[in-house]
């Protein structure tokens, strides 16, 4: 059950999630994120590097992830019967500068991203987005996804990361766990849901950089005690004015900024010490934001999330553990131009429910967004999603996904939609 419990540690992001592997340790994999590019700072498991001799003791890490899915809009939406596919490839490497050149607490990292796909969310008329691999246009990208320097200070209680990165990894990230007791979990998640609200709070969408529009900026993390953290970040804010920050390799500071801060912590409930965690944050976007004839001078918002172990079963030393974890999200903003003004979401994941398949998971999720009346004629969109994620072998996972979209928000003329997806994830 130790692996299941580790999935519920602080979601303070990668700034203090960099645990050191030893030659005796083997990266453990439990549930894999429906979109690892959105919630994990390290690409894949690092086994690609080990194949060419880059073992953890060398200070070098090379890994990657490949995702591909097929989607069928069975009925409803904008284009019922339509199909589409998505393909994502990420290759990344890190260098521990302490091990390589003797610079304590320093690390550099970089990732390359290749994406190609279809407007499957547009086919369904979904503003929330039932498939997180499809983000904003263009729908074909080759880009420098990340390039950063991370410096740990004060016994890792303060870390600073400077460069091009993905803020949704550090902020609003309800799904990302943190390793405990020096156990490496390179690509775990609290859920395998694939819909977009699981990875970016809809009330920040259009302003907050993330997958796949990463941005240049600075991220600070403070962890005075193990059970509490504070994160703060400031980034290039030109995404809100329509500039695609992800597919531009160099900084593009035009006087607008996206600033965000988050604090959170963990707890244990009852005799079984059921782990839970929660976070709360606020953000501000500067600059003139426009939508048609409407203009506003910046905007701001608040969000929160929580996760709790609901049930766990111990005594399965040969398995990853059995249990159920639930999570909750919310967000609001004061924007006149962004797509959503409010959001609530929740979900649950069952781990190891089939004794002979300890690394399979079953999950459900619900997302409800209040649409900005300046942008849409409908005032809301509701999405329900369920999946079964199966580990075929080692680092290969497959998952069928069923999504129901009630009142697709793009147009009041679109009827309720049903979509089927089949995703394959390969980690290396």
Indicate residue ranges for each PLM-predicted region.
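Long, well-ordered mid-to-C-terminal structural blocks that present hydrophobic/aromatic surfaces
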Residues: 266-355
């Amino acid at each position: 059950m130790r692996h299941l419990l580790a999935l519920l540690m602080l979601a303070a992001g990668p700034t203090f999630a960099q645990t050191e592997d030893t030659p005796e340790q083997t990266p453990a994999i439990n549930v894999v994120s429906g979109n690892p590019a959105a919630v994990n700072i390290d690409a894949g498991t690092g086994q690609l590097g080990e194949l060419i001799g880059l073992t953890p003791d060398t200070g070098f890490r090379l890994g990657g992830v490949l995702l591909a899915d097929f989607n069928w809009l069975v009925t409803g939406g904008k284009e019922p019967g339509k199909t589409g596919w998505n393909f994502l490839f990420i290759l990344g490497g890190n260098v521990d500068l302490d091990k390589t050149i003797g610079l304590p607490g320093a690390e550099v990292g970089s990732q390359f991203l290749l994406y190609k796909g279809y407007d499957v969310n547009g086919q369904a008329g979904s503003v929330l987005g039932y498939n997180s691999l499809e983000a904003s246009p263009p729908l074909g990208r080759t880009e420098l996804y990340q390039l950063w320097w991370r410096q740990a200070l004060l016994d890792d209680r303060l870390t600073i990361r400077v460069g091009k990165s993905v803020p949704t990894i550090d902020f609003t990230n309800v799904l990302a766990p943190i390793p405990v007791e020096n156990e490496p979990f390179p690509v775990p998640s609290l859920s395998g849901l694939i819909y977009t609200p699981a990875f970016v709070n809809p009330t920040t969408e259009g302003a907050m950089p993330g997958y796949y529009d990463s941005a240049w900026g600075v991220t600070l993390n403070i962890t005075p005690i193990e059970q509490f953290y504070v994160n703060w970040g400031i980034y290039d804010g030109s995404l809100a004015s329509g500039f695609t920050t992800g597919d531009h390799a160099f900084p593009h500071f035009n006087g607008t900024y996206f600033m965000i801060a988050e604090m959170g912590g963990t707890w244990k409930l009852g005799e079984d010490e059921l782990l839970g965690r929660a976070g709360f944050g606020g953000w501000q976007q500067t600059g003139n934001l426009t939508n048609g004839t409407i203009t506003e001078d910046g905007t701001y918002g608040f969000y929160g999330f929580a996760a709790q172990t609901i049930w766990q079963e111990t005594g399965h030393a040969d398995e990853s553990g059995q249990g159920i974890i639930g999570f909750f999200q919310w967000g609001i903003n004061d924007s006149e131009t962004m797509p959503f003004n409010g959001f609530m979401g929740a979900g649950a994941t069952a781990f190891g429910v089939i004794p002979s398949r300890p690394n399979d998971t079953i999950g459900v999720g619900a997302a409800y967004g209040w649409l900005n009346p300046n942008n849409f004629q409908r005032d809301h969109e509701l999405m329900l999603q369920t999946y079964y994620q199966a580990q075929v072998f080692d680092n290969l996972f497959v998952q069928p996904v069923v999504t129901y979209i009630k009142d697709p928000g793009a147009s009041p003329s679109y009827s309720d939609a049903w979509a089927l997806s089949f995703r394959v994830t390969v980690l290396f």
